[in-house]
């Protein structure tokens, strides 16, 4: 019986891990253990060592109060890996946690095979991470086609598998979705994404609500959809919706329906922006972090944009309002501009689709199948 130890530190990594496990399950004699979420637990006989929300943290300053707790979780994870006598360690994204675990494990178990899924964005900042990963991992699976050369040139075996959004089926029939969700055909629908972490939600919510309130003055037929990453998030958002002037509804675990049915989206920067683009919905992106974290990020990064669509295009296809520009009046003005101009909305969708095609979207590529095939043939 071969044992694979997985570590996923956030929902996007859990999604990838779940699909990889699903593709590995066809091989009898494999056992899965480690840290993950609902997708990994549903995919196989997998029970997480602890909930991934414990390590789902972001930012440089925001993470400081949790450092002692994270160190204890790293210690616990390393001990669990050693005791599990795993044949292969697979870490997924969440470099702040997974890299530290892998580095410790490499010293203690120098012969253990180790794979990391989701290449760190060395093309954006901290290029030296490529060398650091080469010292620890046996193989790296990249989601973007241009990433492997950054790592192979420093001696790390890096394979392009494709982006996990390719694993999903996106909704196309907006009329049918409106009927299913009982939304009148005359309503204008704005999808609002706030993030998967409580801190992100609380940071963006007041700004986003103020922006929506401003739009609702001009659009009386406005309905807001809040797709929830977790049902508990409704209780976080609800107190901010007292005395509001617009209609709203929550959709739990139905984010792709929320993206597809909407006329426009106001999105917190992240993987969700790719999913919204793949759903054929135009958007405005906004993002804000702690000011000290932002200063550190600005000193490190080499790119102008935060949305992957814009980064690859080298231009602002999707309007971005980051940090000091993440203001309700600026956001609402741009949303109004797009709501009132169908041609601008259409142009964004068309340009975004071309970028998605560069990423392999609509190519029938299955990243998890490719990853599982490499794992089975070369590492077990």
Swiss-Prot record:
**Pfam families reported for this sequence:** LpxB
Catalytic activity annotated for this protein?
a lipid X + a UDP-2-N,3-O-bis[(3R)-3-hydroxyacyl]-alpha-D-glucosamine = a lipid A disaccharide + UDP + H(+)
One CC-aspect GO term? membrane
Q: Does the keyword Plastid apply?
A: no
Is Phosphoprotein among this UniProt entry's keywords? no
Which biological pathway?
Answer: Bacterial outer membrane biogenesis; LPS lipid A biosynthesis
Q: What is its EC number?
A: 2.4.1.182
Name a biological process GO annotation. Answer: lipid A biosynthetic process
Sorted keywords for this record are: Glycosyltransferase, Lipid A biosynthesis, Lipid biosynthesis, Lipid metabolism, Transferase
Q: Which Gene Ontology molecular function entries are recorded, alphabetically?
A: lipid-A-disaccharide synthase activity; phospholipid binding
Q: Which family does it belong to?
A: Belongs to the LpxB family.
Q: What does this protein do?
A: Condensation of UDP-2,3-diacylglucosamine and 2,3-diacylglucosamine-1-phosphate to form lipid A disaccharide, a precursor of lipid A, a phosphorylated glycolipid that anchors the lipopolysaccharide to the outer membrane of the cell.
- State the protein's name: Lipid-A-disaccharide synthase
């Amino acid at each position: 019986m071969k044992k694979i130890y997985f570590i996923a530190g956030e929902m996007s990594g859990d999604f990838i891990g779940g699909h990889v496990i699903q593709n590995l399950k066809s091989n009898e004699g494999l056992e899965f253990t480690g840290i993950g979420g609902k997708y990994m637990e549903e995919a196989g006989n997998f029970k997480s060592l602890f909930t991934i929300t414990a390590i789902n943290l972001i930012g440089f300053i925001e993470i400081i109060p949790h450092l002692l707790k994270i160190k204890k979780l790293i210690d616990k994870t390393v001990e669990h890996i050693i005791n599990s006598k795993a044949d292969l360690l697979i870490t997924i994204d969440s470099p702040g946690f997974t890299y530290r675990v892998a580095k410790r494990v490499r010293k203690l178990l120098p012969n253990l095979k180790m794979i990391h899924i989701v290449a760190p964005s060395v093309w954006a900042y901290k290029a030296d991470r490529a060398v650091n990963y080469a010292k620890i991992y046996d193989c790296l699976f990249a989601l973007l086609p241009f990433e492997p050369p950054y790592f192979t040139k420093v001696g790390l075996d890096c394979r392009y598998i494709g982006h996990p959004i390719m694993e999903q089926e996106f909704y196309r029939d907006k009329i049918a979705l409106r009927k299913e969700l009982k939304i009148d055909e005359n309503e204008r629908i704005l999808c609002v994404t706030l993030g998967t972490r409580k801190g992100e939600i609380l940071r963006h919510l007041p700004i986003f609500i103020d922006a929506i309130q401003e739009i609702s003055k001009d659009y009386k037929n406005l309905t807001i959809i809040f797709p929830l990453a977790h049902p508990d998030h409704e209780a976080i958002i609800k107190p901010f919706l007292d005395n509001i002037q617009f209609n709203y509804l929550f959709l739990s675990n139905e984010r792709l329906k929320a993206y597809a049915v909407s006329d426009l989206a106001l999105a917190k920067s992240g993987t969700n922006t790719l999913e919204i683009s793949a759903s054929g919905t135009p958007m405005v992106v906004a993002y804000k972090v702690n000011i000290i974290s932002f200063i550190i990020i600005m000193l490190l990064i080499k790119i102008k944009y935060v949305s992957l669509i814009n980064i690859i295009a080298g231009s602002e296809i999707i309007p971005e309002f980051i940090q000091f520009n993440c203001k309700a009046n600026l956001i609402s003005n741009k949303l109004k501009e797009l709501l009132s101009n169908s041609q601008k909305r259409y142009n964004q969708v068309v340009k975004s689709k071309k970028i998605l095609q560069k990423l392999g979207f609509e190519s029938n590529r299955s990243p998890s199948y490719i990853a599982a095939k490499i794992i089975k043939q070369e590492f077990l």
